[in-house]
Amino acid sequence: MFDTIISNGIIIDGTKKPRYQADIGIQNGNIKTVGDLSNSKAKNIINAENLIISPGFIDMHTHSDISLVNDKYGESKAYQGVTTEVTGNCSFSPFPAGKKGPNNLKKGLWETAALADDPNTNWTWNTLNDWANTIEKNGTSINIAPQLGYLSLIHI
């Protein structure tokens, strides 16, 4: 018995094979079987008839570095099929803060890059690890691949 079966979906798997219709059996958060599962049982069944199922997309150019701190669900990305974001683009990253602290970095990035900041975000991190721990503590539903923006280095 599966936890979830996604049934009747049109699968485009990124391998250059033609699209095909199949079911997907999920157990413990992992895909276990792809094929005809019409005789299988599951706790949850999602009917994906006439819907496309594909692997998650990687968004290589994002500016979600700050919004990820507050947006634990990443809904704007998840609804588009994005499962991984690359941050730190266009020379901006919210770390390292250096000896002058995160508020100096925040101010410098605002003045230099016209950074749109959520006023509810309290920049308490100084390093990549601090930033990543803040996001992990708050929770997130997507994977993050951070880059160090060189503009941040100017302000430390």
Segments and roles (model prediction):
Residues T4, T15, T62, T83-T84, ...:
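Ser/Thr-centric signal marking residues that sit
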Residues M1-I5, I10-G56, D71:
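Histidine-rich, glycine-flanked metal-binding segment
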Residues I53-S76:
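Di-metal (Zn2+ and/or Mg2+/Mn2+) metal-binding site signature of metallo-dependent hydrolases
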Residues G29, H155-I156:
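Adenylate-forming
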Residues S40-K41, H63-S64, L148:
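Residue-level signal for pocket-adjacent positions within structured domains
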Residues Q27, H63, G88:
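Acidic/polar N-terminal loop/beta-strand segments that form early-domain functional surfaces
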Residues S38, I66, S93:
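Glycine-rich nucleotide phosphate-binding loop and flanking beta-alpha elements
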Residues N70-I154:
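Divalent-metal coordination cores built from histidine and acidic residues
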